[in-house]
Amino acid sequence: MAFDLAARLAERRAADLYRQRPLLQSPQGPQVVVDGQPLLAFCSNDYLGLANHPDVIQAWRAGAERWGVGGGASHLVIGHSTPHHQVEEALAELTGRPRALLFSTGYMANLGAITALVGQGDTVLQDRLNHASLLDGGLLSGARFSRYLHNDPASLASRLEKATGNTLVVTDGVFSMDGDCANLPALADVARARGAWLMVDDAHGLGTLGANGGGLLEQFGLGVDDVPVLIGTLGKACGTSGAFVVGSEELIEALVQFARPYIYTTSQPPALACATLKALELLRKDTWRREHLAALIRQFREGARQIGLTLMDSHTAIQPILIGDAGRAMALSRKLRERGLLVTAIRPPTVPVGSARLRVTLSAAHSEAQVQLLLNALAECYPQLESADA
């Protein structure tokens, strides 16, 4: 048989790398039902607790009554409705950029932006730990592709010396598996000095960072001249779905003309855009959500330190517990689930071999008591894992 899929699947099972889809049988929130089991979840990207907010739900209902269900066509045919346009205007205002362009998913936004901006004869340089969609965009662009050392401006500068054609430097804002933040001011300086453009995917920073929720760039005070291409997602802190690119008038017009993932797909349901508008309003107005989330992050890190857990250098909602071996990470995840807690084990190839981890994600919807329940369970389960290895 030409395609021996059974052997590939068996090999993945044997390496403790087999993935399965848990079945969510409740709305998003800290308290969920998964595969029939009530659980306290610490693995959602609903950072501000907006995915099940009653005002956002009502906005979707009202949007469906006014605009119907489907987008009907691509944006360039007859699928670009008033709610879509209003979301783009709100996103441009939130991020302090001239214009925004709405995409159906973050993956499509990253592929669309990179492949529209660089091609054969050009160069794309990426952080080694970038999200898969960024790496795929670089590979598919046809440009000369290279990765610099993680969050290392000197490594980037060295690779820029060999760059040809138009050069795009691409980085995550908040790295999704480590939770650390890119040194954007230094990366922007290096890129600008060599005539390159910096593109930042701030999927995990938007909404959670910055005084107004504008993300990591707002926190650093960086403008469109520092970061010409900014990507954000709407399915995380915003609680809905979709993604966007913000930047100059010329950038957005270029993407409308050349970004194939934008051109050749049906637009999102207009009702979804109505829900997103309400979520963006809450994201900006409810500053207590960011303040509460920051307090939970401090609580978790201090508690984890007392237990003796190995954490990554993260002060964001993503708090990975480094385990190392994939089998041990799975074992700890199972022990927590037996105690009613859902924390996902992240294994290769998502992370490098030998760096499997439990990826704890915190939300403004969590309470201090719920975070303490997680810490108590970790204090009980982690020593059991260590003693089993002894």
Curated annotation (Swiss-Prot):
Top EC class for this record: transferase
Annotated pathway: Cofactor biosynthesis; biotin biosynthesis
Described function: Catalyzes the decarboxylative condensation of pimeloyl-[acyl-carrier protein] and L-alanine to produce 8-amino-7-oxononanoate (AON), [acyl-carrier protein], and carbon dioxide.
Protein family: Belongs to the class-II pyridoxal-phosphate-dependent aminotransferase family. BioF subfamily.
Domain of life: Bacteria
EC number: 2.3.1.47
N6-(pyridoxal phosphate)lysine modified-residue sites: K236
Gene name per UniProt: bioF
Record protein name field: 8-amino-7-oxononanoate synthase
Reaction(s) this enzyme catalyzes, per UniProt: 6-carboxyhexanoyl-[ACP] + L-alanine + H(+) = (8S)-8-amino-7-oxononanoate + holo-[ACP] + CO2
Species, as recorded: Pseudomonas entomophila (strain L48)
A GO molecular function held by the record: 8-amino-7-oxononanoate synthase activity
Positions with a binding annotation for substrate: R19, H131, T350
GO biological process, any: biotin biosynthetic process
Cofactors demanded by this protein: pyridoxal 5'-phosphate
Quaternary data: Homodimer.
Top-level taxonomy: Bacteria, Pseudomonadati, Pseudomonadota, Gammaproteobacteria, Pseudomonadales
